[in-house]
């Protein structure tokens, strides 16, 4: 996974002609990820909570798909509008000890905010949380949530 850096920021502000091979490689992956989102009607994101928050790779993914004029745009007043409407998202979230939507869960509200930023509002959460405490119950609860969706 490529992580956002000064190289990425500079690449977003210069013309394609001025981009280095490193810039082009980063944008190649970003373009691919953005296209996947645009072409998908249904998106499933399966993610664990690591130390109360998202894994670094999920943060990197969100940075790579947050592209002006691709996944969001600025209005004249500076406000932002997401460009990925009419998507259905299923978040399958697991944790060892963190209760989903508790004060300790920084992943779920962050990820919902990111998806809303892109214009995605139709989000279903399937939680398999606190698996280290009662694995069988966590799996059963997740299966029950899935059966209500399908």
Where are the regions a protein language model picked out?
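N-terminal beta1-alpha1-beta2 submodule of the flavodoxin-like/Rossmannoid cofactor-binding fold
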Residues: 1-47, 52-60, 133, 145-150
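Short gly/ser/thr-rich secondary-structure transition/capping motifs
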Residues: 24-28, 70-76
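Short, well-ordered alpha-helix to beta-strand connector turns
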Residues: 40-41, 86-87, 120
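Hydrophobic/aromatic beta-strand patches that form the interior of the parallel beta-sheet core
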Residues: 44, 90-92, 124-126
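Residue-level signal for short, function-critical loop segments
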Residues: 49, 95, 129
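A mobile, often basic/glycine-rich helix-loop segment
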Residues: 59-71
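Short, glycine-/small-residue-rich phosphate/pyrophosphate-handling segment
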Residues: 75-117
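Glycine-rich phosphate/pyrophosphate-binding loop and the adjoining helix
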Residues: 101-150
